[in-house]
Amino acid sequence: MTKEIKVKVQLVRSPIGTQESHRATVRGLGLRGVNSVSELQDTPAVRGMINKISYLVKVI
């Protein structure tokens, strides 16, 4: 079996005042409040979402 590669993302800045599409991306990654952490599969789609809101999140 192959081991799935995971990536942990932490919301470090509030999405208040950002574009609606960026807030939707934050919700799509499973992040709620500031400092919330979500563990996701490392796929190109997830990487693209992280890149889009890189100023709001930190990869840990």
Swiss-Prot record:
Keywords, sorted A to Z: Ribonucleoprotein, Ribosomal protein
CDD domains assigned to the protein according to its UniProt record, in alphabetical order: Ribosomal_L30
GO molecular function terms noted in the UniProt entry: structural constituent of ribosome
Superkingdom per UniProt: Bacteria
GO BP terms, alphabetized: translation
Cross-referenced NCBIfam families: rpmD_bact
Assembly behavior: Part of the 50S ribosomal subunit.
Record-stated family: Belongs to the universal ribosomal protein uL30 family.
Name listed for the protein in its UniProt record: Large ribosomal subunit protein uL30
Species per Swiss-Prot/TrEMBL record: Polaromonas naphthalenivorans (strain CJ2)
Upper classification of the organism: Bacteria, Pseudomonadati, Pseudomonadota, Betaproteobacteria, Burkholderiales
Gene responsible for this protein: rpmD
